[in-house]
Structures are given as structure tokens and as C-alpha cells.
């Protein structure tokens, strides 16, 4: 019983963290640009090599 409680807590923390990161990426134009989130967003979602911050927006590389 104790083990399932620990697993439940870890699972809920992971889900909250995932939702929070996705929210920051989606609302990037309203908050200060974060380099690591910008680069990850460009690589995974847009297929670009990298991205850089030109506050307040994230700009992906051309290639």
C-alpha cells in the first residue's frame, strides 16, 4: 500500500511538470523566452536544428 502511494505521487509530479512545461512553450510570446525551452521546441515540434531567444519570442534557425 505504501509503495503504490509513492508511485502515485511520482506520477502526479511528472504529469504536473509536463503540463507546466507545455504551457510555457505554448504561451512563449507572453513570457520571457527561455533558451532551453526554445531550442527544444524548435527541434522537436518544428524540425529545426536549434533556436534562439530574441526577447520575448523564440526564433528557430532557418535549416
UniProtKB/Swiss-Prot annotation:
Repressor as a keyword of this entry, yes or no, is no
Q: Which keywords has UniProt assigned to this entry?
A: Disulfide bond, Secreted, Signal
Recorded superkingdom: Eukaryota
User: Disulfide connectivity?
Assistant: 33-53, 38-58, 42-60
Q: Which residues form the signal peptide?
A: 1-23
Q: Subcellular location, in the record's words?
A: Secreted
The UniProt entry's GO CC annotations, sorted and at most eight, read: extracellular region
What is the recorded name of this protein? Cysteine-rich peptide clone 2
Source organism per UniProt? Tityus costatus (Brazilian scorpion)
Amino acid at each position: 500500500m505504501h509503495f503504490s502511494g509513492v508511485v502515485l505521487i511520482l506520477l502526479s509530479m511528472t504529469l504536473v511538470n509536463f503540463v507546466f512545461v507545455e504551457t510555457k512553450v505554448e504561451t512563449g510570446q507572453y513570457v520571457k523566452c527561455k533558451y532551453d525551452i526554445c531550442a527544444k521546441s524548435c527541434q522537436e515540434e518544428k524540425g529545426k536544428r536549434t533556436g534562439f531567444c530574441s526577447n520575448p519570442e523564440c526564433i528557430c534557425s532557418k535549416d
